[in-house]
């Protein structure tokens, strides 16, 4: 079973079957799925090892060379005085990219273990693991290729790295804080059946999606400069605005009724405050 499947007949999800199939989360279903969540945790936990293998040892770069692309030399390793960091043997720029992979894995494992109550089937966990590995590797290989790397656009720290890192930190912290705020609200029995409209959610109705879009764009920008950052950011903005938000809005309209309509009036922005 993959995310979105197995929702048919779920009395807690009043949406149409077409909307349920498009959703990656079984809304209103809190069936325990320890195997799936364990698989999610493990796959996300080991994914940074893949990024390290690419950054430190050039895993897969032979394919780039085979099609005529050149890759960057390793660069001088970082010296911080911290053995755990220095032992990685990565240049400062590569260390930042690895840190982004680690940060994303940690954030998502916090989500699956402490913040999400919905089911996570094993197949869904595998899909999420592969998805993240592909997008993170895209940024890493874009960095390594001299044709696309943000690293060759000036001296360290390059503007694309500074801007991308800022977007990454703001985005991932926004997503995490928003989800923690909502979780704390939902854990209070007095709030059962209520929509959470406070905290960061008062700035945009799907602020967690906005945060995700920002950090994904920032990660891509840090690796593949402005073009890749813009493409990745546009992709997620499109997916959320055309798929995820409409089907979640349908769920919230039918579950919360007048509460949700009032929220929409008070908070007109859906994804990113003052933009969309």
Model feature map: region roles:
Residues 2-67, 149-181, 187-276:
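Hydrophobic transmembrane alpha-helices
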């Amino acid at each position: 079973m993959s995310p979105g499947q197995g929702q048919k007949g779920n009395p807690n999800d009043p949406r149409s079957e077409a909307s349920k199939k498009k959703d990656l989360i079984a809304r209103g279903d809190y069936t325990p799925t320890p195997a799936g969540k364990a698989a999610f945790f493990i796959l996300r936990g080991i994914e940074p090892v893949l990024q390290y293998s690419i950054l430190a040892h050039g895993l897969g770069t032979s394919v780039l060379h085979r099609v005529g692309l050149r890759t960057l030399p390793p660069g001088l390793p970082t010296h911080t005085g911290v053995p755990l960091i220095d032992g990685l043997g990565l240049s400062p720029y590569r260390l930042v990219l690895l840190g982004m992979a680690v940060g994303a894995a940690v954030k998502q494992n916090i989500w699956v273990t402490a913040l999400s109550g919905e089911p996570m089937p094993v197949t869904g966990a595998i899909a999420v693991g592969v998805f993240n590995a592909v997008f993170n590797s895209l940024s890493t290989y874009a960095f390594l290729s001299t044709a696309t790397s943000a690293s060759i656009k000036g001296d360290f720290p390059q503007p694309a790295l500074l801007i991308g890192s800022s977007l990454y930190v703001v985005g991932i912290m926004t997503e995490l804080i928003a989800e923690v705020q909502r979780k704390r609200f939902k854990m209070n029995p007095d709030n059962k059946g209520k929509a959470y409209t406070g905290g960061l959610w008062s700035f945009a109705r799907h602020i967690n999606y906005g945060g995700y879009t920002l950090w994904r764009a920032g990660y891509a920008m840090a690796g593949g400069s402005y073009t890749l950052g813009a493409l990745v950011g546009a992709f997620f903005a499109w997916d959320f605005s055309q798929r995820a938000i409409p089907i979640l809005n349908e769920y919230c309209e039918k579950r919360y009724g007048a509460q949700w309509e009032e929220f929409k009036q008070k908070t007109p922005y859906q994804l990113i405050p003052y933009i969309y």
